[in-house]
Curated annotation (Swiss-Prot):
Domain of life, per lineage: Bacteria
Annotated source species: Roseiflexus sp. (strain RS-1)
Name recorded for this polypeptide: Ribosome-recycling factor
Keywords assigned by UniProt, alphabetized: Cytoplasm, Protein biosynthesis
Chief subcellular location: cytoplasm
Biological process according to GO: translational termination
GO molecular function, one term: ribosomal large subunit binding
Gene label: frr
Transmembrane spans: none
């Protein structure tokens, strides 16, 4: 029972960590990455589809993304989705291929993005603490129902805290790595 609670908490903490990684991948650094645009939703074929289902996204140069739609009819819709996104990048297209030149970030924009990274890391830490709190409540319930002893409850609390600390360190590391990427010129 205790192991089930700890396993469930660990699984949820892994998901929270992965969600942070995925979110931070969409934050623009000075270098081109398909993750910047692959999540964008494009109005095509009467539905809203992610860009990575409509085109291949390549990085031929460090500051250039090339988007090659599978169907040339979707070029305008993809360009429009990029323009409407918060990326701040203007696409150029020749009717078949869309090119995104990734401009150098200004110092002010870098600091703004760093604050955004810190905020996302903090949100993820809050999610971890909520997961820990829910697991502690489950353990408390098990103890009240006399399914585990007080000693088992205390040991499980310590294991849960170690687990939480490990994931918090991982979040801090992910955040610091992304901040360094953003601040890199």
């Amino acid at each position: 029972m205790v192991n089930d609670v700890l396993r469930e908490a660990e699984s949820r903490m892994k998901k929270a960590t992965e969600a942070l990684r995925n979110h931070l991948a969409t934050i623009r650094t000075g270098r081109a990455s398909p993750a910047l645009v692959e999540h964008l939703h494009v109005e095509a074929y009467g539905a809203t589809l992610p860009l990575n289902q409509l085109a291949t996204i390549t990085v031929p140069e460090p500051r250039l993304l090339v988007i090659q739609p599978f169907d040339a009819n979707t070029v305008k819709a993809i360009s429009k989705a990029i323009m409407n996104s918060e990326l701040g990048i203007t696409p150029t297209d020749d009717g078949r291929v869309i090119r995104l030149a990734i401009p150098q970030l200004t110092e002010a924009r870098r600091k703004e993005l760093t604050k955004l990274v810190r905020a996302r890391v903090e949100e993820s830490k809050i999610a971890l603490r909520n997961i820990r709190r829910e697991a502690l409540e489950d353990l408390r319930d098990l103890e009240h129902e006399k399914m585990i002893s007080e000693d088992e409850h205390r040991r499980a609390q310590e294991k849960l805290q170690e687990l939480t600390d490990r994931f918090v360190r991982e979040l801090d590391h992910i955040g610091a790595t992304k901040e360094a990427e953003v601040m890199e010129i």
